[in-house]
Amino acid sequence: TNANVYVIVNEGEVFQIDSGLKSSFNAIRKFYSENSLRPNYVLITHAHVDHIGALAEVYRYYKPKIFAHGLDLKVIRGEERMPNRSFLMRLFGAFIKAEPVREADEIINKNFKNIEVIETPGHTPGSVSYLYNDGKERYLFVGDAAFERKGKLFVNRTFSLDLKTAEESLNKIIGLKPVTILPGHGNPVKLEQ
């Protein structure tokens, strides 16, 4: 299914988290048009097609700076395929592909005001989360490092490449409370202290 796409307006700059499937682009463009915005940056949580499928369209239309973890960059750039543990992922990947975006760059050691990059591998080798602090609340955009169902967070065992590392990343995420978790699929989950 399609992934959630988030937008942060931070210090006058627009940060988009992930891009969803290619079919998401019209909704993304409509959102920006209706809100008189355009993305300065696209921060990718990981390189699965449901999170990067519309990335090439977003890049062509808006020319934002694109960042992802180095371990997933070769997939985004079209230089490698994402390894797949499950038959479902191989099947999904055979039918739905993302157009390469060669302009993507490494996120690690990149500094953005109020946004911290947190490595949360396991779902993919280069999975990262983005912790945004607006001065009042903390929000963690986790991609697929945590899935939400009925208000609970869990690791998706079918689509995660390294289950042990994914569980460790989920524990790291939970350890960041108080924070509102914004997953790639499902609804936000507020973790109290």
Predicted regions and their residues:
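Conserved beta-strand hairpin/beta-sheet module of binuclear metal-dependent hydrolase folds
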Residues: 1-34, 129-143
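Pre-active-site segment of Zn-dependent metallo-hydrolases
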Residues: 11-43, 88-104
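Residue-level marker for buried hydrophobic side chains located in beta-strands
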Residues: 15-17, 43, 66, 139-141, ...
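Metallo-beta-lactamase
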Residues: 22, 72-119, 125-192
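Short amphipathic alpha-helical segments
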Residues: 28-30, 55-57, 80-81, 133, ...
